[in-house]
Regions:
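Small/polar loops that bind or transfer phosphate-bearing groups
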Residues: 10, 104, 140-141
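Conserved N-terminal entry element of GNAT/NAT acetyltransferase domains
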Residues: 1-16, 180
Length: 180
C-alpha cells in the first residue's frame, strides 16, 4: 500500500503538532547553517505558528499517514516573519497592487527532508497569492531555507542579521519573487 501525501489548510487543532515539528526542524535542519546557539535562539524566540495565518486560512500542513510532515503558508498581512511569541500589535493588510504577499514559516520534519514538500507548499502558496491579486511574494529566509527559495525562483534583495536575547546574531536574507 502506498502512502498518500495531502496538503490542506491548517486548523487550530493542528497547532500542537506544528509547534513540535517547528521545534524539531528548527534545531535539526539548521545544522551546517547555524551554530547550535544560533539554532536554539532562533527556534525559541522567532520560529513558531502565527495563529493569524491559521485564522486567515493561508497556512497549510502536508500530511502522510496522518502525520504532519511540513507546514507553511502565505500572508496578505504586513508581518514578514515570526510566530505568535514574536508579534506585537495589529497586523495590517497589504495592498496586493503595490506590496508583495508574504511567504511565512515553512518547516519540514527532519524525518522527511528533500522530498519536495517545501516546493509543494510554495507552489500552492504562489497559486493562492496570485489568485488574491498579488504581483510579487517576499520572505525572510533563514540560511537553511535559502536553497529552496532560490530553487523556487526567489532572489535575495537584502542580507541582514537579527539580534536575539543573549546578543546572539542570526543571519537572514530578504528574498523576493515576481509572480504575475
Amino acid at each position: 500500500m502506498t502512502s498518500q501525501t495531502t496538503l490542506r489548510p491548517a486548523t487550530a487543532g493542528d497547532i500542537p503538532a506544528m509547534e513540535a515539528l517547528i521545534q524539531r526542524s528548527g534545531i535539526l535542519l539548521s545544522k551546517g547553517f547555524y551554530s547550535d546557539q544560533q539554532a536554539a535562539a532562533v527556534t525559541r524566540h522567532v520560529f513558531g505558528v502565527d495563529s493569524q495565518l491559521v485564522d486567515d486560512h493561508t497556512y497549510f500542513v502536508i500530511e502522510r499517514d496522518g502525520k504532519v510532515l511540513a507546514c507553511g503558508g502565505w500572508s496578505k498581512r504586513a508581518t514578514l516573519f515570526g510566530g505568535d511569541q514574536h508579534k506585537s500589535g495589529p497586523d495590517p493588510l497589504l495592498d496586493p497592487a503595490t506590496q508583495p504577499a508574504r511567504i511565512r514559516a515553512f518547516f519540514v520534519d527532519p524525518s522527511a527532508p528533500r522530498q519536495g514538500l517545501g516546493r509543494m507548499l510554495m507552489e500552492h502558496c504562489e497559486r493562492e497569492a496570485t489568485a488574491a491579486g498579488f504581483q510579487a511574494m517576499e520572505l525572510a529566509a533563514t540560511m537553511p531555507g535559502v536553497p529552496l527559495y532560490l530553487a523556487c525562483g526567489f532572489e535575495s534583495v537584502e542580507d541582514f542579521s537579527l539580534t536575539l536575547p543573549g546578543n546572539i546574531a542570526v543571519p537572514l536574507s530578504r528574498m523576493r519573487k515576481r509572480i504575475s
